[in-house]
Swiss-Prot record:
Cofactor field: heme b
Gene3D superfamilies found in the cross-reference section: Cytochrome Bc1 Complex, Chain C
Its membrane topology: Multi-pass membrane protein
Name of this chain's protein: Cytochrome b
GO molecular function, one term: ubiquinol-cytochrome-c reductase activity
Function summary: Component of the ubiquinol-cytochrome c reductase complex (complex III or cytochrome b-c1 complex) that is part of the mitochondrial respiratory chain. The b-c1 complex mediates electron transfer from ubiquinol to cytochrome c. Contributes to the generation of a proton gradient across the mitochondrial membrane that is then used for ATP synthesis.
GO biological-process terms attached to the record: mitochondrial electron transport, ubiquinol to cytochrome c
Protein residues bound to a ubiquinone: 193
InterPro entries per record: Cyt_b/b6_C (IPR005798), Cyt_b/b6_C_sf (IPR036150), Cyt_b/b6_N (IPR005797), Cytb/b6-like_sf (IPR027387), Cytochrome_b (IPR030689), Cytochrome_b_C_euk/bac (IPR048260), Cytochrome_b_N_euk/bac (IPR048259), Di-haem_cyt_TM (IPR016174)
Any one cellular-component term (Gene Ontology): mitochondrial inner membrane
Predominant location category: mitochondrion
Residues annotated for heme b b566 binding in this entry: 89, 188
Protein family: Belongs to the cytochrome b family.
Length: 371
C-alpha cells in the first residue's frame, strides 16, 4: 500500500506546463549518479589500492575481467557525461533565475563541490603518469595556506610525498563520497519540491500546472534515451576520446610530463589557477571560481527573474559561456604567450559576469521605471 501512495503522489506532483527540455537534466543527473555507483562498485571489486599494483589492476580489469572494459569505459566516460549534464543544469539555473530558490541552489552548489572532489580522487586511482602529477600539483596548492599549509599537505599525503598511503585514502574517499552525494541529492530534490520548479517565463505557475506523470516522465525518458545513446556510442567507438596519452604510462615520480593537466571538466578552474602568477592568489581564484556561484541568489537586483526578458543579461550570459569555453581551451596549452594573456583576459571576464550582475539588474530596473 505505501508504494501505491508514493506512485500516486509522484503522478499527481504538479509541474508547470511550460518547462522546457532544459529542465530534464536533473533526471539525467540522477541516472548518471546511479550508473556511476553501479559501475564503480564492479570496478572496486577488482581494483587494488596499492602504488605497485593499481596500474596493473586497471589493465587486468580491461583485459581479463568479463565486460571489465565496458565497466571501466562506462565509469570514465560516464563521469564526463555527468559533468556535461551538471554544467548544463547550472547554466539553465543561471539563465532562468532558478538560483532564487536559495536553499535548492545552495544545496546544489555544495553537491557540485562534492562531485568535483569525488572526480578528482577518482582521476588519481589508475596511478598513471598524468594521474600522479595532477594529484601532486593540485594537492600541493594546500601549501599556499599560511601557517597550516605544509602540515595539512603532509597530513593529506600521509607522508612527505605522494605515496601508498595517499592512494589508499584517495580510494577510500572516492568510495565514500558518492554516498554523501546521494544523500545530498535527496535533500536537493526535497528542497526543490518545497518551492516547486521555476519556468522559462520566471513567473508563478500555480494557475497552470499538470501532473508530472505521464507528461514529464515521457519527456524525461526521451532525453535519457538520447543520453544513453550518446554514452554507448562514445564507449563503443571513441573510448579514449577523453583520456590523456600520458596516463597510459605507469606513474613515475622521476619523470615530469611536459604539460600537466587534469580532466577536461576541471580545465576551466585549472586555467583560472594558472592565469595568476602568485601561488596563493591562484589557489584563491581556483576556489572562488566555484564558490562565486553561492553569491548569485544574494546579488540578484532585477525585478525580473528570468533572462528571457533581459537582453543585456542574455548577452552577458552567452559571453560567460564563451569565456568558459575559452578558458577550458587555453588550459590545454603550454604556459607561454599568447595563451597566458588569453587565460588572464578570459578569467577576468568570467568573474566580471558575477560582479556586474547586480549592477545590470539595477540598471534594467531604472530603464523599466522610466518607460
Amino acid at each position: 500500500m505505501p508504494h501505491q501512495q508514493i506512485l500516486i503522489l509522484f503522478g499527481l506532483l504538479p509541474v508547470a506546463t511550460n518547462i522546457s527540455t532544459w529542465w530534464n537534466f536533473g533526471s539525467m543527473l540522477l541516472a548518471c549518479s546511479s550508473m556511476q555507483v553501479l559501475t564503480g562498485f564492479f570496478l572496486a571489486v577488482h581494483y587494488t589500492a596499492n602504488i605497485n599494483l593499481a596500474f596493473s589492476s586497471i589493465v587486468h580489469i580491461t583485459r581479463d575481467v568479463p565486460y571489465g572494459w565496458l565497466m571501466q569505459n562506462l565509469h570514465a566516460i560516464g563521469a564526463s557525461m555527468f559533468f556535461i549534464c551538471i554544467y548544463t543544469h547550472i547554466a539553465r539555473g543561471l539563465y532562468y533565475g532558478s538560483y532564487l530558490n536559495k536553499k535548492t541552489w545552495l544545496s546544489g552548489t555544495t553537491l557540485l563541490i562534492m562531485l568535483m572532489a569525488t572526480a578528482f580522487f577518482g582521476y588519481v586511482l589508475p596511478w598513471g603518469q598524468m594521474s600522479f602529477w595532477a594529484a601532486t600539483v593540485i594537492t600541493n596548492l594546500l601549501t599556499a595556506i599560511p601557517y597550516l599549509g605544509t602540515t595539512m599537505t603532509t597530513w593529506l599525503w600521509g607522508g612527505f610525498a605522494i605515496n601508498d598511503p595517499t592512494l589508499t585514502r584517495f580510494f577510500a574517499l572516492h568510495f565514500i563520497l558518492p554516498f554523501g552525494i546521494i544523500s545530498l541529492s535527496s535533500l536537493h530534490i526535497m528542497l526543490l519540491h518545497e518551492d516547486g520548479s521555476s519556468n522559462p517565463l520566471g513567473t508563478n505557475s500555480d494557475i497552470d500546472k499538470i501532473p508530472f506523470h505521464p507528461y514529464h516522465t515521457y519527456k524525461d525518458m526521451l532525453m535519457l534515451s538520447l543520453m544513453v545513446l550518446a554514452l554507448l556510442t562514445t564507449v563503443a567507438f571513441f573510448p579514449d576520446i577523453f583520456n590523456d596519452p600520458e596516463n597510459f604510462s605507469k606513474a613515475n615520480p622521476l619523470v615530469t610530463p611536459q604539460h600537466i593537466k587534469p580532466e577536461w571538466y576541471f580545465l576551466f578552474a585549472y586555467g583560472i589557477l594558472r592565469s595568476i602568477p602568485n601561488k596563493l592568489g591562484g589557489a584563491l581564484a581556483l576556489v572562488m571560481s566555484i564558490m562565486i556561484l553561492l553569491t548569485t541568489p544574494f546579488t540578484h537586483t532585477s525585478t525580473i527573474r528570468s533572462m528571457t526578458f533581459r537582453p543585456i543579461m542574455q548577452f552577458m550570459f552567452w559571453t560567460l559561456v564563451a569565456t568558459f569555453t575559452v578558458i577550458t581551451w587555453a588550459a590545454t596549452k603550454p604556459v607561454e604567450p599568447p595563451f597566458t594573456a588569453i587565460s588572464q583576459a578570459a578569467s577576468t571576464m568570467y568573474f566580471m559576469f558575477f560582479i556586474t550582475n547586480p549592477i545590470v539588474g539595477w540598471f534594467e530596473n531604472k530603464i523599466m521605471k522610466y518607460n
